[in-house]
Structure formats: structure tokens, C-alpha cells
Amino acid sequence: NLEAGKPIVETDFDLRFNEQTYRVESNLGPLVADAIHWYVNQTHHNDFTLAVAGLIRDEIKPGTNGEQLVNDLYRVVPLGSGVFDNSAGYSLAQVYLTAAEIKNVLEAMMLAPKLSTGNYPYWAGIQYKYNPRRILLDQVYEVSLGDPVNGYKRIDLSKKNENLYSLTTNNYVLEFFGLVQEVTFGLLKVSPKDRYGNPVTDLNDLIIDGKPEQAGLQEMKEWEGFIQYLSQFPDVNGNE
């Protein structure tokens, strides 16, 4: 029930982003990651979420009255199309990883922006510590999962920890996981798995079904999650 001209949220400050000059300091990139993380957790358990700079396409500015319409917000993450339904927007997917593989992903994503600024990551649901003085691809030494409200819990990064943790991203970014070994020259490996720990070769099998109680696959879209997240913000100035 989203109409292009429907007001969703108001802001009195800029939410800034520029892939080349303002990606590290951006307050919009983390918002996109937070939105996806919240959206998926409404229907599925999700441990942490990844969004990347290269798929953010517009900033959010207050304009004359601060109102942000559906079409304003859609322009932030408008790219892609469905895997099966061919509707607008990249679909969200969920992959399961071991703690050691999470470390490998973090190591790879610290390297990835050096290959392309579009690879700069924005995370939600995860905190990590690294030492830049350590050798490349072995700098992450602590990872915690959680959220600011309930706190973060450190996880065991050793290979003896066989627990699986869920990561959500869109289907485009998910393809990168198959390239981790290539990007790291074979030093790091990640084996995408389903929730049962079975290795997955067709990454399309990891697309999230937003309404599993219905027949078929109802793809969850990145842009829809962004808008739904903002739409649940309270009206603080009483002009709803």
C-alpha cells in the first residue's frame, strides 16, 4: 500500500552519502543497514546485516518542509530486480556462516574497498575489533553480535565453534561471498550454508521468503525494508 507521493517520515537534517568523498562519515549508509536488519527481524531471526556503498544512489535532504515521500526514499536504494518475481529492487537473502567464516568475511570486506569504493561496508547487528598492525587478512581479533538495546555478546572465533550465524544482505552483494577466496588469493574461504548447515551452490536458494505461510516465494525487497523501517518512527512534532 505504498503510493509514490505518500509522506513516510520527516527530517530536519541531511542524511548524507557520497561514494567517492563521504562514505566513511555517512549517516545514511548505517541507516540503510539498520533498516534491513530491522525489517528481516520482523519475520525471521537475523544475527547481522551487510549493506554496501555502491548500491546507495541518493541522499535524503529536508527540502522545504522535511517530508520524505515514498519516491524520495525509493531513490536511496532503487537498484536491481527480483530473482523470481522480476519486480523492482534487489531481493534480500540470508546466508549462514560459522564464527570463523564471519571473521573471514570481515577481513575480506576490509580489503574490498581498496579494490572499489562501492564495496565499502555498512553493518548492523555486529561489532568487531581489529589491529591494523597485524598482517593483512588476519587483523580481526574480536567479534560481538547483538544490538544497542540488549547489548552485544562476544562470539568464539575459533574453528571449534560450530554454531551457525545468520547474515542478511541483498542478492547482488551475496554473490561476493563466492569470490572471497578469489579476492584473498585463496587465503580465506567462506562456504555459504542454509540454516541447517548444508552447503549452498545456487545462491538464489538463499532468497528470503517474506510470507512463508503463502504459496510460492514472496521476495523481501531492500527498498521496501528501508521504507517500512522509516515508516514506524514516531511522530515527535505532532503534525502527523
Predicted features along the sequence, with ranges:
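Catalytic centers of hydrolytic enzymes
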Residues: 1-240
